[in-house]
Swiss-Prot record:
Residues annotated as domain Toprim: 84-179
Organism, scientific name: Bordetella pertussis (strain Tohama I / ATCC BAA-589 / NCTC 13251)
Main function: May play a role in DNA repair. It seems to be involved in an RecBC-independent recombinational process of DNA repair. It may act with RecF and RecO.
Zinc-finger ranges (C4-type): 61-76
SUPFAM superfamilies documented for this protein: Recombination protein RecR
Family recorded in the similarity comment: Belongs to the RecR family.
Molecular function, one GO term: zinc ion binding
Record's protein name: Recombination protein RecR
Record keywords: DNA damage, DNA recombination, DNA repair, Metal-binding, Zinc, Zinc-finger
SMART domains: TOPRIM
Keyword Metal-binding: yes
Pfam family name, one: RecR_C
Matching CDD domains: TOPRIM_recR (cd01025)
Length: 202
């Protein structure tokens, strides 16, 4: 049972802020707060400054929707990338995993989420119209759906497949070497590289 002792308002605010992190409950948040305040004041100050700077200076890339300091991120601005390939992922973490596989040299679009009806997240919330406009720019020749192999990821991929295929785009999906129910963030780079090479038409 959580302690019922009264806590200072700044401590309560810190705990509530830490609870916003994924997978962090009230007990974990309280432990983090105690650790920072008791054992790592310098780290607490660094964390606060880093969060403030990130919120102030980061924005979404105008082309791929990932995080950047500039209007267009370094990946989208790289002339060595293949503009005919567009890989759609759920999160920047998934984008980083695909990049670490060294099996992809195209461009990306980051959804910043996935369709999750129970959470009130649908195509409108993910701004699918912007995704479609990006894919239909006249340069993209193939769209690779690299959403996670979870129920929500599959639903997202199915919706995008229908929307993009009816517009004449070639749409492919990562091969099933990625285990069902898994998230790309936790899949090894070798498996992702194989799944990219063996991707299948939808």
């Amino acid at each position: 049972m959580d302690p019922q002792l009264p806590e200072p308002e700044p401590l309560i605010a810190l705990i509530e802020a830490l609870r916003r992190l994924p997978g962090v409950g009230v007990r974990s948040a309280r432990r983090m707060a105690y650790h920072l305040l008791q054992h790592d004041l310098q780290g607490a100050d660094m964390l606060g400054r880093a969060l403030s700077a990130a919120v102030q200076h980061l924005r979404h890339c105008a082309r791929c929707n990932s995080f950047t300091e500039d209007e267009v991120c370094a990946t989208c601005a790289n002339p060595k990338r293949d503009p005919g390939l567009l890989c759609i992922v759920e999160t920047p973490a998934d984008q980083n995993m695909i990049e670490s596989s060294h099996g992809y040299r195209g461009l990306y679009y980051v959804l910043m989420g996935r369709i999750a009806p129970l959470e009130g997240v649908g195509p409108r919330e993910l701004d699918f119209q912007r995704v479609i406009e990006r894919a239909c720019d006249g340069v993209v020749q193939e769209v690779i759906l690299a959403t996670n192999f979870t129920a929500e990821g599959e639903t997202t991929a199915h919706f995008l497949d229908d929307a993009l295929s009816e517009r004449g785009l070639k749409v492919t999906r990562l091969a099933r070497g990625v285990p069902a129910g898994s998230e790309l963030e936790y899949v090894d780079a070798g498996t992702i590289a194989w799944a990219l090479m063996e991707r299948r038409s939808t």
